[in-house]
Amino acid sequence: RSSDLPINDAKVEWLFKNPINDGGQFTGISDNLYKYGVVPAEIMPETASSSNTKLLGKMLARTLRQTGIQLRNASEKGESLAQLRKRKEDGLKKVYRLLSLNLGVPPTSFSYTLKDKDGKVISTETYTPQSFYERFVGTDLRGQFVMLMNDPSRPYYKVYEIEYDRHAYDGKNWTYVNLPMDEIKQMAIASLKDNTM
């Protein structure tokens, strides 16, 4: 909880400067896939905002900052935990509305027709995003892979975890093993050669 810290605390400043990131770390993707599932592009196609997220990211960041300031001010005025939770939920409703308007509302269930390479129908079934993930991915990707990174500002051959860098509240922080670039390069080449990537 950062509301007990002064507004000029380094952690608070970082949270307000970076209320949302562009994503892309494997741990965040695997957390979200496991939690929410997936849908085929035919069911939920790209939108202008999903293929170019810069403006949406700015709108989300502004909404999150406004909500954060409102929560801090309300906390300083002594509002109850129930009142603060209500304010937080109101802020999250604004976030959901922005996402829904820009990306669409994900389906809770959908029918999908599986076809072979020649276009012949194999089956048509009803799925939820989670059941589609289970059927076509079938593996819980969380904890199955290790991220390798080159960060020369930190000692090599150690595991690092970046606090507050996750895609879901209950997800895992971005964690990586810090290695010299030459070793990462050798591992990438070996992985490509033996098809384990």
Spans of features found by a protein language model:
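Flexible glycine/proline-enriched surface loops and loop-helix/loop-strand junctions
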Residues: 11-17
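Surface-exposed loop and adjacent secondary-structure segments within mature catalytic domains
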Residues: 13, 34-68
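N-terminal targeting/trafficking signals and adjacent low-complexity tails
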Residues: 18-22
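Stable alpha-helical elements in mature extracytoplasmic
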Residues: 25-34, 91, 95, 184
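Non-catalytic membrane-recruitment/adaptor modules and adjacent regulatory linkers
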Residues: 27, 35-36, 175-179
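Loop/turn elements at helix/coil->beta-strand transitions in domains of secreted/extracellular proteins
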Residues: 41, 195-196
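Aromatic-residue-lined binding/catalytic grooves and analogous aromatic/hydrophobic interfacial grooves
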Residues: 65-167, 173-179, 191-194
